[in-house]
Amino acid sequence: MLIDHYIMDFMSITPDRLSGASLHLIKAGGKRLRPLITLLTARMLGGLEAEARAIPLAASIETAHTFSLIHDDIMDRDEVRRGVPTTHVVYGDDWAILAGDTLHAAAFKMIADSREWGMSHEQAYRAFKVLSEAAIQISRGQAYDMLFEETWDVDVADYLNMVRLKTGALIEAAARIGAVAAGAGSEIEKMMGEVGMNAGIAFQIRDDILGVIGDPKVTGKPVYNDLRRGKKTLLVIYAVKKAGRREIVDLIGPKASEDDLKRAASIIVDSGALDYAESRARFYVERARDILSRVPAVDAESKELLNLLLDYIVERVK
């Protein structure tokens, strides 16, 4: 993908170990959902020229996403992502932290460099502001996610607020920045941001589902990771708070055995939490689709591809 080449060229820096750590997860693969949303939004609203201008902006979104993954993996002590050992497992915590910091800075440098790709000063400023806001929201979301591991005083509203920040904010930014690249006005930018936010919430709910029933060989991540960390996913909250299956409280967390986690997963499925989560994911995808239908398109094919991407979000198996 063109975005990958851009990032790899950009991050071809010395020392080699820093470059290697920074690009470890990029080279491992991934969905590239966020930069794809940026590029499709730019083309939908401004045609092929806008899409070409958006390449460094789309790369900045993926670079920021990769930075957040590296740091999240350190905090969660996750050992596998995208089917390979995580960055801190391969390079150690110190190098992984440094790689994340470097990617974070690189994401904003890419936006500055977008001026050389035909972006105006105002467009670059708007994109910079959007990503800056998203970066703060992501950190807030991660903070809530960590705090929720320490308590059971978490309800669906708390969960949704956390997800809007941790996952929704960057996908919202991806869509808004695509609109900025196309030269769209503030109202269209806002509407595309709402498309991205709702898609992001659905994406995270689907992630929660795959954390319970996903195949590790397909997802590239160990199953039950969220349960092992004691994370308050939508499924866990529903099973405990809505279905009254409080035995889950004693079956998840860092001290839980593999049998405990399997039993917790079985209880979650039996409680109806899986069906509930799937229905909520579809609700947010349909909300995104409704908003998207009201956005005028210069390129109809790109709009259709965005609609297909919404389908993928709730149907994906990894």
UniProtKB/Swiss-Prot annotation:
Catalyses which reaction(s): isopentenyl diphosphate + (2E,6E,10E)-geranylgeranyl diphosphate = (2E,6E,10E,14E)-geranylfarnesyl diphosphate + diphosphate
EC number: 2.5.1.81
UniProt keyword annotations, A-Z: Lipid biosynthesis, Lipid metabolism, Magnesium, Metal-binding, Transferase
Gene Ontology biological process terms from the UniProt entry: isoprenoid biosynthetic process
InterPro entries: Isoprenoid_synthase_dom_sf, Polyprenyl_synt, Polyprenyl_synt_CS
Family affiliation: Belongs to the FPP/GGPP synthase family.
Function noted in UniProt: Probably involved in biosynthesis of the precursor for C25 (sesterterpanyl chain) moiety of C25-C25 diether (2,3-di-O-sesterterpanyl-sn-glycero) membrane lipid. Catalyzes the condensation of isopentenyl pyrophosphate with the allylic pyrophosphates to yield all-trans geranylfarnesyl diphosphate (GFPP). Geranylgeranyl diphosphate (GGPP) is the preferred substrate, however methylallyl diphosphate (DMAPP), farnesyl diphosphate (FPP) and geranyl diphosphate (GPP) can also be used as allylic substrate.
Protein name: Geranylfarnesyl diphosphate synthase
